[in-house]
């Protein structure tokens, strides 16, 4: 037992000694100067900045869209690579393609940059001619367009504007077109040698006419769409004549209306000694001239309206024109009776005006009331003459009563 206890105590002592020895031998870092501490801190900050930049670059590369790579690769590939035909096309004859049928659409349009610029008028004429040709020649195929070039200078200039700017592969009748949209070219394309030689042999002997497509296109546009002609002066003269003929009877009627209104005003002013107004027949103010067997509706309505305005009575003589009731030939009978009554009334009115014109008229309220009553009397008498469709308009009466400023009614 004693031996075991001694051994345990010995082991504990040895362990404690080892721990103390390690603590004494551990290196202690002491910075004697402050500059060394600041430099150490700056180094740590620089390392942290570098790590942050590297982390940011890693995130940018992870979320990249590939735009930078595409931009860097533009110098290696052609910008018009998407327009090139997939299959290699064999070189055909000179008239079966503009440049052998081996160029793309974009390059073929750029190859014409050496042409001289044209004026705006020529461009407008070419566009008009091309639109007219497209509307008339949509059903034509490309084979007919190219085969018709050898027919003559007229057909050559016509077919020159219908060229299709697409790559074609001609093997007998088989064709493989990569694009299904046909582009109608409205530019000046260089004509082949065969066409230019045939076009130069025109009857006039000038080769420039066969080579200049704008002139031929402009001429064709004029043929397809002729210029508008100015309207002849005969139409204006005829319209003026018709207006004069139409308004001539109305002017005559207006002149007659003025004369009759003056006569009616003079007749109303004349009053006898007893203070009673003279009795005028209703038909004395009505005047019908040039009665036709079947008068037109427009002239009849105008005469009736003029008669209603000519009469001094303030109620309507005849109804307004209505589209429901057509013109009846039986109205001539009533017009004839009005004409007879008008002649009799004028004669009696003239005789009375000559005999009594000395006394001034009265303008009192009683005189106006008696005048209105006397105006209503012939209204009742004449209502028996007209047919039933005219009665509703005859029952209306309008009397004008002037109000004096001294007394209020």
Swiss-Prot record:
Disulfide bonds: none annotated. InterPro entries: DUF4529 (IPR027836). PANTHER family: CHROMOSOME 16 OPEN READING FRAME 46. Residues 134-160 have a biased composition (Polar residues). GO terms for cellular component: cytosol; nucleoplasm. Pfam families: DUF4529. This is Uncharacterized protein C16orf46 homolog. Residues 12-32, 133-160, 194-213 are annotated as: Disordered. It comes from the Eukaryota.
């Amino acid at each position: 037992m004693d031996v075991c206890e001694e051994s345990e105590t010995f082991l504990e002592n040895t362990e404690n000694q080892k721990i103390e020895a390690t603590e004494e031998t551990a290196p202690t870092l002491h910075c004697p100067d402050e500059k060394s501490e600041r430099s150490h801190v700056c180094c740590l900050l620089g390392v942290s900045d570098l790590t942050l930049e590297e982390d940011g670059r890693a995130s940018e590369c992870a979320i990249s869209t590939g735009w930078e790579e595409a931009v860097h690769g533009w110098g290696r590939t052609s910008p018009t690579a998407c327009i090139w035909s997939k299959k290699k096309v064999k070189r055909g004859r000179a008239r079966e393609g503009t440049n052998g049928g081996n160029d793309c659409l974009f390059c073929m349009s750029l190859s014409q940059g050496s042409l001289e610029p044209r004026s705006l008028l020529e461009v407008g004429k070419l566009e008009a001619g091309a639109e007219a040709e497209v509307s008339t020649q949509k059903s034509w195929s490309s084979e007919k367009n190219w085969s018709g070039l050898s027919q003559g200078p007229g057909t050559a200039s016509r077919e020159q504007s219908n060229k299709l700017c697409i790559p074609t592969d001609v093997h007998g009748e088989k064709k493989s077109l990569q694009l299904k949209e046909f582009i109608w070219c409205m530019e000046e394309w260089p004509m082949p040698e065969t066409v230019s030689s045939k076009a130069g042999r025109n009857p006039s002997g000038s080769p420039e006419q066969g080579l200049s497509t704008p002139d031929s296109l402009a001429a064709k546009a004029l043929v397809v769409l002729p210029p508008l002609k100015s309207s002849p002066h005969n139409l204006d003269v005829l319209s003026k004549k018709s207006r004069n003929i139409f308004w001539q009877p109305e002017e005559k009627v207006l002149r007659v209306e003025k004369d009759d209104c003056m006569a009616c005003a003079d007749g109303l002013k004349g009053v006898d000694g007893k203070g009673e107004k003279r009795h005028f027949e209703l038909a004395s103010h009505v005047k019908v001239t040039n009665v036709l067997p079947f008068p037109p509706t427009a002239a009849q309505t105008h005469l009736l309206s003029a008669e209603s305005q000519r009469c001094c009575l303030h109620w309507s003589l005849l109804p307004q024109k209505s589209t429901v009731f057509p013109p009846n030939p039986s109205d001539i009978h009533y017009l004839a009776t009005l004409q007879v009554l008008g002649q009799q009334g004028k004669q009696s009115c003239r005789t009375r005006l000559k005999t009594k014109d000395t006394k001034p008229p009265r303008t009192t309220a009683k005189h106006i009331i008696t005048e209105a009553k006397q105006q209503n009397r012939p209204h009742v008498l004449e209502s028996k003459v007209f047919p039933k469709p005219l009665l509703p308009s005859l029952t209306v009466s309008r009397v004008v009563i002037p109000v004096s400023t001294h007394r209020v009614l």
